[in-house]
């Protein structure tokens, strides 16, 4: 509830077109890599290879829990992930995208852990 209120209040300051839930990536995306056709790997951001992960920017992603928006922003299809949007940051332990069976298992573990600690 507090997150919804925070987003709603941010939207109503008049400064923002959207407010929505986000969380940070567990690991730095700047140290990420992909498998290449030859079977090896290649960094997406090789310029950060020698940087410590704690020295890299914190990257956020959409938590998909709620979206507030001004009517004109929705009607004009204004892009959401831009400077005119307010991020309501939610801790990672409250966010789980479910696309795979692995994701579902992780969501169940998070839920069980939360129930045990409450």
Residue ranges and their predicted role:
Residues 1-84:
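Conserved core of the sugar-phosphate nucleotidyltransferase
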């Amino acid at each position: 509830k507090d997150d919804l209120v925070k987003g709603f209040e941010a939207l109503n300051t008049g400064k923002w077109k959207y407010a929505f839930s986000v969380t940070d990536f567990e690991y730095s995306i700047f140290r990420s890599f992909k498998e290449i056709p030859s079977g090896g790997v290649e960094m997406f951001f090789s310029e950060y290879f020698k940087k410590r992960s704690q020295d890299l920017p914190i990257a956020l992603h959409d938590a998909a829990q709620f979206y507030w928006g001004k009517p004109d922003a929705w009607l004009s299809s204004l892009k959401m992930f831009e400077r005119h949007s307010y991020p309501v940051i939610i801790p990672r332990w409250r966010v789980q995208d479910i696309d795979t069976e692995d994701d579902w298992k992780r969501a169940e573990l998070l839920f069980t852990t939360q129930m045990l600690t409450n």
